[in-house]
Amino acid sequence: MFEIKVSQEIKDACPVFAGAAVYAAVKNTAYCEGLWKEINAFTEELTTTTQIEDIKHQPVIAATREAYKRCGKDPGRYRPSAEALRRRLMRGIPLYQIDTLVDLINLVSLRTGHSIGGFDADKIQGAYLELGIGKAGEPFEGIGKGVLNIEGLPVYRDASGGIGTPTSDNERTKMNLGTTHILAIVNGYNGKKGLKEAAEMILSLIHISEPTRPY
């Protein structure tokens, strides 16, 4: 288990911020048919009921974008992951099929608008994480993105440095088929509303996709 702290700089910039964490023992799989039926159903619903210009106004996404501005980042250049995923689907580009754990985190993010950090808990260094604001020149290798400029982005740090932002998580702590413990953090830059439901959705999808032992 981990202690998760919120720095004073985040409290000052984002006073209503709240978060929820899920820690579970898991057995990852390459693909889950039932999960992808849900992803495809959501994709159809989104693309038939939403306009691409409306995505940034979804309340949770809008709050995350506002947090970026308060922390010093342009959300038009560095989009929160939930916004980027929805925009991808609206452009007719399917989600990447990665593995079951990554795919279910993406689904919950899509459904709720929350940017969610999904980490291999055994790769996290130390016993606690702290949410702060990225500094100039701070090293961070985004998953599939290469070196990411995290200056002005909210960032979770472990004992070795940054592991997750609302735009991208770090290659160092990413999940893969060998992951046996997951830490998922739901970020509520609009406050507590919807956090419990998002965390429960993550646990439910984990149970559906593969028997697990939640803590």
Give the ranges of each region predicted by the language model.
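A structural-propensity feature for long, helix-poor, extended segments
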Residues: 132-168
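Glycine/proline-rich, flexible active-site/cofactor-binding loop segments
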Residues: 31-84, 90
